[in-house]
């Protein structure tokens, strides 16, 4: 397993080394489905790129204060099967939160996670979970540096629109826990965004 040889920026044992099986490992949670369909992957990618272009064109009016300034170096993301594989391995653990070591040979990797639950027997569409990350833009103050914003409130948004990020790959699992129907989405991004001394994108 080559992932066992990767030295991550943040240290730790690589997720794809620690968990080699692609089967869910969810203890007392009842797994209903895991993995994303081809259509869901396309929808997630399109949602990311539509939002990045909305920001780039200066059409995002939300913020603290809004609007967000337009960008001059915002490119579309492409889907990475490798990033998606590592994201799926992590999602399969049913542990909400970030794993420690998910980098790949060519670059460090960032991550967004989202979890929704319903007592009705239905699961949110993955695009709805991606939109939860976009909604954090309402708390972003573009008049301040990235590092001066409250990272806990805006970190998913900033990773989504980080201009130097080129690829995304996601994994998903749906399970039942104490009568709650939960959908857990993990997206990995490379190269990673959210470096404290940098900015999200170059403004026009």
Curated annotation (Swiss-Prot):
UniProt keyword annotation of rRNA-binding present: no
Record-annotated disulphide pairs: 4-17, 8-101, 26-94, 170-187
Localization of this protein: Secreted
Keyword annotations of the record: Allergen, Disulfide bond, Secreted
Name of the protein described by the UniProt record: Venom allergen 5
Main location: secreted
GO cellular component terms attached to this protein's record: extracellular region
Taxonomic source organism: Vespula germanica
């Amino acid at each position: 397993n080559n992932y066992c040889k990767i030295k991550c920026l943040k240290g730790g044992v690589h997720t794809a080394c620690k968990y080699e099986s692609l089967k869910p490992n969810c203890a007392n949670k009842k797994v209903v489905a895991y993995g994303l369909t081809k259509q869901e992957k396309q929808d997630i990618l399109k949602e990311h790129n539509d939002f990045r272009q909305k920001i780039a064109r200066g059409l995002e009016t939300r913020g603290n204060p809004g609007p967000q300034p337009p960008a001059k170096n915002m490119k579309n993301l492409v889907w990475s099967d490798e990033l998606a594989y590592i994201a799926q391995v992590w999602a399969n653990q049913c542990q909400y939160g970030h794993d420690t070591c998910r980098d790949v040979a060519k670059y460090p990797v960032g991550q967004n996670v989202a979890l929704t639950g319903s007592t009705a027997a239905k699961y949110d569409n993955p695009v709805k979970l991606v939109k939860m990350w976009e909604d954090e833009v309402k708390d972003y103050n573009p008049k301040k540096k990235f590092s001066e914003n409250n990272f806990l409130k805006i970190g998913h948004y900033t990773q989504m629109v980080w201009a130097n990020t080129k690829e995304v790959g996601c994994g998903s699992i749906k399970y039942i826990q104490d009568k709650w129907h939960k959908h857990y989405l993990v997206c990995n991004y490379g190269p990673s965004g959210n470096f404290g001394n940098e900015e999200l994108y170059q403004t026009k």
